[in-house]
């Protein structure tokens, strides 16, 4: 009997996936936080002094302090008016939502820091791999993102602007498009 129940459940699950109902809908709902916004999602730090706490509230200890406004962080969880964030180094903790902004920024290839002197992320005039390079960004450089088309992001940094491959930045998901 147990074998039949398993087999019936398996057939039902496969049918639900193939018809686009059930499991797919549950996943779409699970991707939204209590705020109604998607989880995870990228935002930036609004203030130049932001305490990262070990839990969602001022009663929790501060584990880190960010000292630069505009840094990109990823919201991975929500609780009341607190957001659990992850930074480009993988550090996680909680911050009050009032210290976050919907503005977008990214860090050029933080995973390439310290890999050598001639490692750069090319910023291009157009969103094409053959387009003219307008700047060479060192890994770890902060850029402000204006839009992404799913493969490329239009970004600005001190004295330069252009298109950067989404695969070479931390601050936009692969395939994510926005203006």
Write out the residue ranges for each language-model feature.
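Acidic/histidine-rich, surface-exposed loop or edge segments in extracytoplasmic proteins
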Residues: 46-55
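Boundary regions of SH3-family modules and the immediately adjacent low-complexity/disordered segments
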Residues: 29-42, 57, 65, 74, ...
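C-terminal segment of classical bacterial N-terminal signal peptides
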Residues: 16-25
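A structural feature that tracks compact, well-ordered secondary-structure segments
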Residues: 83-86, 146
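Bulky hydrophobic/aromatic "packing anchor" residues in well-ordered structure
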Residues: 52, 121-124
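Short, charged beta-turn/beta-strand-edge "cap" motif at the junction between a beta-strand
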Residues: 79-81, 148-151
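Bacterial N-terminal signal peptides that target proteins for export
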Residues: 1-12
